Swiss-Prot record:
This is O-methyltransferase aunD. Its EC number is 2.1.1.-. PROSITE patterns: SAM_OMT_II. It comes from Aspergillus niger (strain ATCC MYA-4892 / CBS 513.88 / FGSC A1513). InterPro entries: COMT-like, O_MeTrfase_dom, SAM-dependent_MTases_sf, WH-like_DNA-bd_sf, WH_DNA-bd_sf.
Length: 424
């Protein structure tokens, strides 16, 4: 593309028009038009692609309108939006606003026990991000389609709480951690350690409290439902049906949400979901509460297991590590993979579903931004970083001379890539 500003503006403006036209045509074809755009993973491929292109083009056009002063202004706004959402979550405003109908600011402030003027200020800033809306008579507030979903979906509620109670405080200690421990790779010398004044690793901290364990597991489940991390990308990244009735070991599989998605799409596969005992107990209960068909649940079993211990399931078709190894430094990542090697059968594969960092500017900025965000989140919580393909290859070569990354695939619109590792 021509790098002249006029050419770039013309390019992205035409993409907005073309993409929006296709999306509008799809919306008008529906019997009941939704109030928000459906996830790009739940619509026809062409429409999903148009949504991705629209987001990227709009993002780039917005960038062109900002001079340095505007950039700093927007950063200030973004910080205050985050602060406002955290405030609204802390005082349970999302759950206190009725899912249907509206409530006055006066009554809401009384129920929440917060000053009415502060409540109004926080909600009205959130409204600029399509969270809440004023409805009916002056002084009445109601849910927007987005905030209603954030209030009613239990996994999104957990994600919101995790963001407010853990992610935000940790990020504020990023500078302090680097100043205190420059260059450290220790699992207990992180921004999270400073934010919560503890001396173990992040996962030690989580495992010490069952409530933290459940909140973290539920938030990870919620993340997997967003379009960029949707489990449907994993379903499309490999010919799973070629495994027949093989066993997939879902290591660190938390609530089993990934195995459930695969089981629903591939009716012959069987699954063993492994995680820490507290997580397993909660996950079994959640699976029972979901009342899924027996054709799905009878093919999924849970097993307490530590990633660093030898893999007890022998000869499985696939050992799946989805968003697991990025939480661990290279040494421990190698140890986890080595724990699988003795269990491998002649045709067994190891699947790593994780971010593969691209060259700067080589993919859409809306996708790269999320990858770079995750890169820093990992550093702040676990003193690790996301990896490039060369980093992944170096780790696999340290595990065994007989293992190779044979295939790497990133489904369009996905943040995660699938790395297929086989014995050679």
């Amino acid at each position: 593309m021509d790098d002249r500003l006029s050419s770039q503006l013309e390019h992205y403006a035409s993409q907005v028009t073309a993409s929006a036209t296709l999306i509008i045509r799809h919306l008008k074809s529906l019997k009941d038009e939704p109030s928000t755009l459906p996830s790009q993973t739940s619509v026809p491929t062409a429409v999903g692609t148009a949504q991705l292109r629209l987001a990227e083009a709009a993002f780039q056009l917005l960038h062109f309108t900002r001079d340095p002063g505007n950039v700093l202004t927007q950063l200030t706004v973004d910080l205050q939006v985050i602060s406002a959402v955290r405030w609204l979550l802390h005082f349970e405003i999302f759950s206190l606003v009725p899912l249907e109908g509206s409530i006055s600011y006066h009554e809401l402030s009384s129920v929440a026990n917060v000053p009415e003027n502060l409540l109004r200020s926080h909600i009205r800033l959130a409204m600029t991000c399509h969270l809440f809306q004023e409805s009916g008579p002056i002084g009445m507030v109601a849910h927007s389609p987005v905030s209603r979903q954030l209030a009613s979906d239990p996994s999104l509620v957990s994600w919101g709480q995790y963001f407010a109670n853990s992610v935000f405080p940790t990020a504020t200690k990023n500078v302090n951690a680097t100043a205190a421990w420059p260059g450290s790779k220790a699992l207990n010398e992180t921004a999270h350690n400073l934010a919560f004044n503890h001396h173990g690793s992040f996962f030690d901290y989580v495992s010490q409290d069952p409530a933290r364990t459940v909140e973290f597991a539920n938030s990870m489940k919620a993340v997997s439902t967003t379009s960029l991390f949707d489990t449907c990308h994993l379903c499309k990244s490999f010919d799973w049906s070629s495994l027949g009735d093989g066993v997939v070991v879902d290591m660190g599989g938390s609530t089993g949400h990934v195995s459930i998605a695969l089981a629903e799409s591939f009716p012959s596969l069987r699954f063993v979901v492994q995680d820490l005992p507290d997580v397993v107990s909660n996950s079994i209960r959640q699976l029972e509460e979901r009342q899924l068909p027996l054709s799905v649940t009878t093919r999924i079993q849970f097993q307490g297991h530590s990633l660093l211990h030898m893999q007890p399931v022998k000869g499985a078709a696939v050992y799946l590590l989805r968003q697991i190894l990025h939480d661990w430094p290279d040494r421990e990542a190698v140890q986890i993979l080595r724990s699988i090697v003795p269990a491998l059968g002649p045709s067994s594969k190891i699947f790593i579903a994780d971010i593969v960092l691209p060259e700067a500017g080589s993919i859409p900025a809306t996708e790269e931004q999320v990858m770079r965000c995750n890169d820093l989140l990992l550093h702040q919580f676990t003193n690790t970083l996301e990896r490039t393909l060369e980093d992944w290859q170096a780790i696999v070569s340290r595990v065994s001379d007989n293992l190779r990354i044979q295939h790497v695939y990133r489904d369009p619109g996905s943040i995660l890539s699938l790395l297929v590792i086989e014995t050679v």
